[in-house]
């Protein structure tokens, strides 16, 4: 079986418009790697997703989101669990627009020059959450390297508005790395710390140049460690994808690094390429291997480990948090 190769060179076959939202090939045309696809691996039988159904809340949720001009990472990143989650009335809200300043070649979120922040978004988000009567919400964002605080102030405004309208709702935030602005961002977040702090490492450090250009493995670890030092009572969380070319030992080492940086909760799921323009799947991890990861996670001291092919960082996030010991109601 042939193996896909990643060649570091500029791609210039797709016209680039910095003002437009770039997806797939257009988004990846200007990163210094070119993905050479080998033989496409056949999806194994354990990869199964549930499509949205008109008999569920799937379309109701989509309509409410459009009405309030909100985005979800479920839609923007083409999450395979969108049918199940929307059908159960849950979603991961994506704030600060739908154009990311990064071009990670595993991710399906669009790239481009971001729009100005919507000053009404925090209140619109809070009203939507109140209307849906959600008890647990996940708030994430695109990377906003154009903002002096990396968008941390906008996160705080969203948290404060949600708590004003839905004081019993628990809030998990899935943040970018606030590159070069982490100390400032953490200081700003003191005004309204979340109930769970999540930032994904995504993959092993060896693969960062290909998978997370512009990011730094140690920087991401330190972000969560610094937050934990400031808020020891707030659980910290991170996630990893498998299938990008890493080894099992590399995954276990990432897990050890997480625990060494006081990360409490862990998610591990199978990477699925959003398109042929994205990084290819280099292996499908067997359920037995996922079980091994889970067992090792608890041996290392994680309070909760959600591990499986279809697990994503915010998939069943409420169940993950409560299984880890998060008590009902905001943590303050």
Swiss-Prot record:
Record keywords: 4Fe-4S, Cytoplasm, Iron, Iron-sulfur, Metal-binding, S-adenosyl-L-methionine, Transferase
The family classification in the record reads: Belongs to the radical SAM superfamily. Lipoyl synthase family.
List its EC numbers. Answer: 2.8.1.8
Which compartment or compartments is the protein found in?
Cytoplasm
- Give binding positions for [4Fe-4S] cluster 1: 74, 79, 85, 314
What HAMAP family is this protein classified in?
Lipoyl_synth (MF_00206)
Question: Which organism is the protein's source?
Answer: Paracidovorax citrulli (strain AAC00-1)
Name recorded for this polypeptide: Lipoyl synthase
Q: Which cofactor does it need?
A: [4Fe-4S] cluster
Entry note: cofactor: Binds 2 [4Fe-4S] clusters per subunit. One cluster is coordinated with 3 cysteines and an exchangeable S-adenosyl-L-methionine.
What cellular component terms from Gene Ontology apply here? cytoplasm
Output the CDD domains linked to this UniProt entry. Radical_SAM
List of residues binding [4Fe-4S] cluster 2: 100, 104, 107
Spell out the PANTHER family in the cross-references: LIPOYL SYNTHASE, LIPOYL SYNTHASE, MITOCHONDRIAL
Q: Into which EC class is this enzyme placed?
A: transferase
